[in-house]
Amino acid sequence: MSSDSKKRKPKVIRTDGGPQEGKRGKADGEQDARYYSEECEVDLRDPIKDYELYKETCQELQRLMAEIQELKSRGVKDNASEIDERRVQSCVHFMTLKKLNRLAHIRLKKGRDQTHEAKQKVDAYHLQLQNLLYEVMHLQKEITKCLEFKSKHEEIELVSLEEFYSEAPTEISRPDITLTEPHQQTLARLDWELEQRKRLAERYKECQTIKEKILKEIEVKKEYLSSLQPRLNSIMQASLPVQEYLFMPFDQAHKQYETARHLPPPLYVLFVQASAYGQACDKKLVVAIEGSVEEAKALYKPPEDSQDDESDSDMEEEQTTKRRRPTLGVQLDDKRKEMLKRHPLSVTVDLKCKDENVLHLTFYYLMNLNIMTVLHLTFYYLMNLNIMTVKTKVTTAAELTTAISAGDLLSPDSLLSCLYPGDHGKKTPNPANQFQFDKVGILTLSDYVTELGHPYVWVQKLGGLHFPKDQPQHTVTADNSLSASHMEMTMKLLRTRLQSRLALHKQFASLEHGVVPVSSECQHLFPTKIVSRLVKWTAIPFEDYTELPYTKDVVEAGLAEDTHLYYMALIERGTAKLQAAVVLNPGYSALPPIFSLCLNWKGERTGSNDDNIRAMESEVNVCYKELWGPKPGYQLLTNQLQRLCMVLDVYLETEPHDTTVEGPKEFPQEKMCLRLVRGPMRLKPFKFNYPQGFFSHR
């Protein structure tokens, strides 16, 4: 074996020499010939039989290799011939395996070629399909365009078929043809439409001729009426004493309307709509115009060019050289004043109530901000902001009783706050004003509302101004319809707000003296004898209210805001003291007050640790509709306080007696109750039943 390998080794590694290359070329040619012959042979041979031959050859090789291994393992020299014989047989089998391998590769190549050809055909068919689909889509689009095509005659509104056949002459309608052919029917209807339009054109010319004649007559009458003006003026002057005597100030109203011509558009819209509403629906509504007409006229006059003499110009130059330049702060102050400048004219509205109490409203217009404000109700116009503002002032027929806790009820800052939900009047409703504020260093308009008035949203709507939030606009035109749609509801809300605040003002005066006023109409809501009494009623700031531990739930629920009014009531009976923190919504009495309770008796008891305290809060906060009393419900607050005194009596009298303490019970039971407690929470009977006079559970 070693000698044979040494002889074969040079043939394997030798790579140079001409004869070898020649031999290699000849072998390659023979191999190509065999390749082509075997390629043809593949079609004639059965792959399954080749597979069986492959298996048999492999088995035979395994057998021969095993025999060679066995013969070599014996180590007998006579076995060399047998080993050579089996080696030759093995080589023959290897040649067979090589041939089968070549045939398998040829079959694989043919399979791939056939697959590639089939794939090319499929791709060609797919491309043809895509082309056909594109042509179909193109044809469908063209068909859709044809179907959607609209002729000019389709835009013409033709008369109905019934009118066409009843009114059109037979020469045009031709019913014997058009009833069966839609195309001829459409043509006939178009002919009839043309005929009608020709007639209308002739009629139009006739009307134009008549119109010109009437216009000439109107001009003649206008000239005649203009000649009457001097005579009418003299008659009006002569009738002034009669007007004053009969309380019919026609001349004064005429002058006011002349003054209204100089109002800015928002104030003019407000004046017209408020006057119309007063004449039609509210005779106690008085509308007037205040301010300087001359200053208003000067706003719309173009500035006159002044030509100074040479001496004057020299003097000015000398003064300017000596004068110091204004600082940046002074310039900003001047710009702010100019920015917040009000229109010289304002509109005042006086709302009179049945008890002769008067709410004065003054409306201003901030021209630069384009919003409205209120004080006296006096309405102003800020010219540069293009907004309106208002100031308030309340005049009462009789002097009100002084009440410390009622100080904020009629103040201008809180009287009209949240007349509509969320309308605090502290921010400008015009989004464009923020850009103007940034230029002059104004952080917010709330710093100037005391001087300018409050720019409530409802004030802008009364002036016909609407500012869209999504598209800020520097200039907004006044809309009469917007003002008219909000006038009636706003005036009713203003009168209701004034009456409710005046009622609260009177009630607070009694509450500060420890007296809970209950009208005769509401006496049936309470028992005859109530021992608990109100000993203290004070106003508290918003910050103190939020710091109370038993008001946490109300604050977290968003029911307490800085625009609301806050009060503290103290109710006592013996050693028991009940503290009630009250949130008064600006919309009282449409929105009820909210009570938060804390009882100091044998410890501190609140709604979080005592179910009966929570039930007492429910009696005044949830069941408030029983306490409204006669409309419009201005006695709700006092009735709630009276009910608190009542339920405190029930709470204390139904509390079980402590046997460890000697002596009589501190709070003997005086109220008649069907059951003292009920349910696992041991709730007490807080509901008063009239006219039986006993207490029961809800």
From Swiss-Prot:
Acidic residues bias: start-end ranges: 305-318
Which GO CC annotations does the UniProt entry carry?
Answer: cytoplasm; THO complex part of transcription export complex
Q: Check the record and name the InterPro entries matching this protein.
A: THO_Thoc5
Which Pfam families does the annotation name? FmiP_Thoc5 (PF09766)
Q: What protein am I looking at?
A: THO complex subunit 5 homolog
Q: What are the disulfide bonds? A: none
Region feature (Disordered): 1-32, 298-327
Q: In which family does this protein belong, per the annotation?
A: Belongs to the THOC5 family.
Quaternary structure, per UniProt, is: Component of the THO subcomplex, which is composed of thoc1, thoc2, thoc3, thoc5, thoc6 and thoc7. Component of the transcription/export (TREX) complex at least composed of alyref/thoc4, ddx39b, sarnp/cip29, chtop and the THO subcomplex.
Segments carrying motif Nuclear localization signal: 6-9
Q: Which domain of life is it from?
A: Eukaryota
Q: Give the residue ranges for region: Tandem RWD domains.
A: 246-698
The keyword Nucleus belongs to this UniProt entry's keyword annotation: yes
The free-text function statement in the UniProt record for this protein reads: Component of the THO subcomplex of the TREX complex which is thought to couple mRNA transcription, processing and nuclear export, and which specifically associates with spliced mRNA and not with unspliced pre-mRNA. Plays a key structural role in the oligomerization of the THO-DDX39B complex. Regulates the expression of myeloid transcription factors CEBPA, CEBPB and GAB2 by enhancing the levels of phosphatidylinositol 3,4,5-trisphosphate. May be involved in the differentiation of granulocytes and adipocytes. Essential for hematopoietic primitive cell survival and plays an integral role in monocytic development.
Provide a Gene Ontology MF annotation, just one: mRNA binding
Keyword hit for Nucleus: yes
Q: Which residues form a coiled coil?
A: 80-246
